[in-house]
Regions:
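Conserved phosphoryl-transfer catalytic core
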Residues: 79, 83
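Amphipathic alpha-helical packing segments from all-alpha helical-bundle domains
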Residues: 125-170, 180-184, 208
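Short, hydrophobic secondary-structure boundary micro-motifs
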Residues: 43, 115-119, 176
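C-terminal peripheral helix-coil segments that are non-catalytic and often amphipathic
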Residues: 1-9, 106, 158, 162-170, ...
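Hydrophobic alpha-helical connector segments
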Residues: 71, 85-124, 183
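Secondary-structure edge/capping motif, primarily at the C-terminal ends of alpha-helices
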Residues: 87-88, 118-132, 193, 197-201
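Helix-turn-helix
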Residues: 25, 33-71, 75
Length: 226
């Protein structure tokens, strides 16, 4: 029998629904602009006009523009992890990471969006933090992902850390490498390959490059098949 993942209607107020829908709408309108514009050139006034809100309403949801990017990245991480977990339930933790990279490729929808997000992140003095995202916001952001509202909010970096720890524990990886070192390698592959693949003259797609870099990493670390 299928498990129902719908939030109980009586447990959700109209105010909560409106808040969640508005926050997601603002974020998605901002990201839509970022596909074509520079981060600095995006006007909060225009974003609010697009979603039919007063300009001041924006600040009820986000303190500044960079918070929208952080929020979107948290949503992207959420969907990537949700898909990776749904596509396989075995004990192979490295395969889970491989699937996460495949999911990331599916989320790369615009070269300019990727460049602007990376640039905005580099300018931040601190690493992006995990943001509070309600179950309603998760559902409204990804209405085609049943049950995603039940997925815990976790950054991809933390997901990698947990998966590598489990991979060492279950014997997929030898314990001689530090978990943090492997996570740094994964983050380097994630961002570096994303940028390098744009200049690849062989016309190979991003998924190929990610698969290749992960294969090289796992081989170098001494991956063992379960």
């Amino acid at each position: 029998m299928a498990v129902k993942t719908e939030l109980p209607i009586l447990d959700v107020t109209l105010r909560a629904k409106k808040h969640a829908r508005t926050k997601v709408a603002l974020a998605m309108a901002f990201i839509e602009k970022l596909k074509d514009l520079r981060f600095e050139d995006i006007s909060i006034r225009e974003i609010c006009r697009d979603v039919e809100l007063s300009e001041g309403t924006f600040f009820n949801y986000f303190d500044e523009k960079i918070d929208v990017v952080n929020y979107y990245l948290n949503l992207v991480d959420l969907k990537i992890i949700w898909k990776a977990r749904r596509k396989g339930q075995g004990g192979d933790r490295l395969a889970l990471i491989d699937r996460a990279f495949t999911g990331l490729v599916e989320m790369v929808i615009s070269p300019n969006l990727v460049s602007e997000i990376i640039t905005a992140m580099v300018r931040q003095k601190e690493s992006p933090q995990k943001m509070a995202i309600s179950p309603l916001e998760k559902r409204y952001a990804f209405e085609d992902c049943p049950g995603i509202e039940n997925e815990p909010t976790i950054r991809l970096e933390d997901f990698f850390h947990t998966a590598i720890e489990a991979a060492v524990k279950n014997g997929e990886l030898p314990g001689r490498q530090g978990v943090e070192d492997v996570v740094v390698s994964l983050k380097t592959i994630l961002v570096g390959t994303l940028l390098a693949a744009r200049r690849d003259k062989t016309n190979r797609d991003l998924n190929y490059h990610y698969r290749r870099q992960l294969e090289l990493l796992w081989k170098g670390l001494g991956r063992k098949e379960l």
